[in-house]
Design a protein with these regions (language model features):
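Phosphate-binding loop and its immediate beta->loop->alpha context
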Residues: 1-166, 170-172, 176-178, 183-184
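Hydrophobic, small-residue-rich alpha-helical packing segments that form membrane-like cores
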Residues: 184-204
């Protein structure tokens, strides 16, 4: 879907579903249809949040910009939204190949220059959720501008498109210290999006 209007900044952890995994495995590639970002945003996240049962508050947050100052690790840990394949039990704790590129508090390892360790548990701070939100938006934008339908309607359809800029609307009275944190989150999101785009993910 392409949204032409503003949408909610809700963030929900959810496994990307592309149909029956068994069909992909038969091709010899268990991860042929893997989406590397662990979160959904906007209307999709709102639908997921509305259907949450039994794990409220553990699968995502609304308006992560409000929590830019909160760098504390999440004590209970984050869980994927939704139900397991049996339709009864809740989805497991957040995990996946993406955790090799962030710390347990959700900091992008590329921002720390070798001073951090890959996450073992998903205890990401609420501040880091802004990084995950921007990462998902960046990857969705790159995916859309490179979609066959989009490229075929423009000149040089065979040339891959590059995302040059993203414009965010923020309050003019935003404190300088908060602007600095937001800028760090944006830089981390860019590095994560690039890492996700060029890495080959295993079955994770």
């Amino acid at each position: 879907h392409i949204y032409a209007r503003p949408f909610e900044s809700r963030v929900e952890f959810a496994v990307g579903s592309f149909g029956r995994d068994a069909i992909s495995r038969r091709s010899g590639r268990a991860n042929a249809f893997r989406w590397p970002s662990p979160v959904r945003v906007g209307p999709e996240a709102m639908r997921l949040a509305a259907a949450t049962q039994g794990n409220e508050g553990a699968t995502g947050i609304s308006s992560p910009k409000r929590y830019l100052w909160d760098r504390r690790p999440n004590v209970q840990g984050w869980r994927f939204n939704g139900r397991a394949s049996d339709g009864v039990t809740t989805e497991p704790p957040v995990s996946g190949p993406f955790m090799a590129h962030v710390t347990e508090t959700g900091e992008a390892l590329r921002m720390l220059r070798g001073r951090g360790q890959p996450a073992v548990r998903a205890r990401f701070s609420r501040s880091s959720m802004f990084t995950f939100l921007l990462t998902e938006l960046l990857m969705q934008a790159v995916s859309q501008i490179n979609a066959p339908a989009t490229r075929s309607a423009r000149r040089f359809a065979d040339v891959p498109r590059r995302l040059r800029r993203v414009i965010l609307t923020l309050p003019p009275a935003m404190p300088l210290a908060e602007q600095k944190i937001l800028r760090e989150r944006a830089e981390g999101a860019i590095k994560l999006a690039r890492k996700y785009s060029f890495d080959k993910y295993g079955p994770g």
